[in-house]
């Protein structure tokens, strides 16, 4: 899948066998260090669809938890990426107690942007430190940090009491 030019259209190039092995090794390290990473996506009939999961990425020099996904070309457009990304978002929020989640997307990748938007991520900023010249960062606050005080609703603050 990572060697397929249509799947890797928005990457600098498809991955070679060696690059794919390095990517697998990176995923193994993620599991060792964090306890999570990318998961395999399969149909109910156990047909391989792609991968989706959570990894730490640098966005403009700061660490961000990213939901990422790859789907085999012939399986694209069927909702698999959206379903898997939503499950990852929920895992990040409910299990990892993550406060913020991002998706880092090539500006021309409209399908990936749609997936991000369908799971509640909105454009936040451009990242100029990635492997492409510019990457679009979509994100969402999953929960509020406990250190942030609750805000008073506007009408309550201006009652004149």
What residues fall within each predicted segment?
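Active-site rim helix/loop that mediates acceptor-substrate recognition in acyltransferases
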Residues: 16-35
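Acyl-donor (CoA/ACP) binding surface of acyl/acetyltransferases
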Residues: 1-10, 25, 38-161
């Amino acid at each position: 899948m990572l060697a397929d030019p249509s799947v890797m259209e928005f990457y600098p190039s498809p991955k070679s066998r060696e690059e794919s092995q390095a990517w697998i090794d990176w995923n193994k390290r993620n599991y060792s260090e964090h306890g999570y990473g990318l998961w395999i996506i399969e149909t109910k009939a156990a047909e391989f669809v792609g991968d989706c999961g959570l990894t730490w990425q640098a966005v403009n020099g700061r660490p961000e938890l990213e939901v990422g996904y790859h789907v085999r070309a012939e399986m694209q457009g069927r909702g698999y990426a959206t379903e898997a990304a939503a499950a990852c978002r929920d895992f990040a929020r409910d299990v990892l107690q993550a406060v913020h989640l991002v998706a880092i997307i090539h500006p021309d990748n409209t399908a990936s942007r749609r997936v991000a938007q369908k799971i509640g991520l909105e454009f936040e900023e451009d990242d100029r430190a990635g492997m492409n010249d510019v990457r679009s960062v979509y994100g969402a606050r999953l929960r509020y940090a406990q250190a942030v005080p609750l805000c008073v609703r506007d009408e309550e603050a201006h009652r004149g009491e």
